[in-house]
Curated annotation (Swiss-Prot):
Catalyzes the conversion of dihydroorotate to orotate with quinone as electron acceptor. FMN binds at A60, G61, L62, D63, K64, T84, N137, N170, K215, T243, G266, G295, Y316, S317. This is Dihydroorotate dehydrogenase (quinone). It is a peripheral membrane protein. Pfam families: DHO_dh. Pathway: Pyrimidine metabolism; UMP biosynthesis via de novo pathway; orotate from (S)-dihydroorotate (quinone route): step 1/1. It is found in: Cell membrane. The keyword Flavoprotein applies. It catalyses: (S)-dihydroorotate + a quinone = orotate + a quinol. The active site is at S173 (nucleophile). It is an enzyme of class 1 (oxidoreductase).
């Protein structure tokens, strides 16, 4: 209810400024004891050999640098994913690069992996004191040639390995040039092979297994989804996140800002991402768990993703439009049902 009063004020601000103000405010409320933990009784969901206190997580992108982990966790999330992070700090694309389309409950972003770099992220994670399930989302620097992308992912994997509950490999952002080519069969075969080999080496070295999740795009043909599913199983990936933002503009092309360049998220992505989940589930047959993301604007949207085959879900744009109550409503609905982990 409180968010319904605050949202019009936040929407008067530039979207990126509002984003910063929101994170700063949450941190202040947490530090001063004015942000109580929202907890709902829920049977833990076991996915990737991890016990998630509830199946509703925060998607990567909201807290890129891990500066607000504990405060965001207080909103009732069962897990938090930070990033995308790259080996070296980078400023991302020029501003403006974040656009609201309120008539469609949508957002377009072309942020470009702006982040403080993996070393600073690790410092922030350590300082947060967060003890819940934490995913760290990794990517490549914009100036790293595509043929050297594997090196960037391996650098990040080595550095975050002991600090993450699981690691997400982002190969599906539309805002880093050529990145989505890593979803092609040849490139993906090489990347997954290298990641699995390094994960095995790190597991042997540290005596700890940190799962790997691959985040894919919603703009894939059925044949591509089939190939990706086969490669995920071949290389024994631990999870797949479906999906990232879309380059399609159905439902917003006629609206102000609707044709801005970048990835579209929010309500227009809901059905598209759920369709990808359903197709993946059909191919994977529970061999690899699916984390559903993209256009969860209501608890019902999340439930439909679970019914399509997801074991967990993640929220981001829905939080911007519906506020923190979306988290508790979604947790309440999903935890009132019997959920089966992959």
């Amino acid at each position: 209810m409180m968010y319904n009063l605050l949202r019009p004020l936040l929407f008067l601000l530039d979207p990126e400024t509002a984003h910063t103000v929101t994170l700063d405010t949450l941190n202040l409320l947490k530090r001063t004891g004015l942000l109580p933990d929202r907890t709902i009784d829920c049977t833990p969901v076991r996915v990737m050999e991890l016990d998630f206190p509830n199946p509703v997580g925060l998607a990567a992108g909201l807290d890129k640098n891990g500066t607000c982990i504990s405060a965001l966790a207080s909103l009732g999330f069962g897990f938090i994913e930070v990033g995308t992070i790259t080996p070296r700090p980078q400023v991302g694309n020029p501003r403006p690069r974040l656009f609201r389309i309120p008539q469609a409950e949508a957002i377009i972003n072309r942020m470009g992996f702006n982040n403080v770099g993996v070393d600073k992220l690790i410092e922030n994670v350590q300082q947060s004191g967060y003890r819940g399930i934490l995913g760290i989302n990794i990517g490549k620097n914009a100036d790293t040639p595509l043929q050297n992308a594997i090196d960037d992912y391996l650098i990040c994997l080595r550095k975050v390995y002991l600090h993450a509950s699981y690691v997400t490999v982002n190969i599906s952002s539309p805002n880093t040039q050529q990145l989505r080519q890593l979803q092609n069969e040849t490139e993906l075969e090489h990347l997954l092979g290298a990641l699995k080999a390094e994960q095995t080496r790190l597991s042997d070295l540290h005596g700890r297994y940190t799962p790997l999740a691959i985040k894919i795009a919603p703009d894939l043909e059925s044949e591509q989804i089939t190939v990706i599913a086969s490669l995920l199983m071949k290389h024994r990936m631990d999870a797949v996140i479906a999906t990232n933002t879309t380059t399609a503009r159905e439902g917003v092309e006629h609206l102000p800002r609707g044709n801005e360049k970048g990835g579209l998220s929010g309500a227009p992505l809901t059905e598209r991402s759920t369709t990808v989940i359903r197709q993946l589930a059909n191919h994977l047959q529970h061999a690899i768990p699916i984390i559903g993301a993209g256009g969860i604007m209501s608890a019902r949207d999340a439930q439909l993703k679970i019914e399509a085959g997801a074991s967990l879900v993640q929220i981001y744009s829905g939080l911007i439009y519906r506020g923190p109550d979306l988290v508790t409503k979604t947790v309440s609905l999903l935890c009132s049902r019997t959920t089966h982990a992959g």
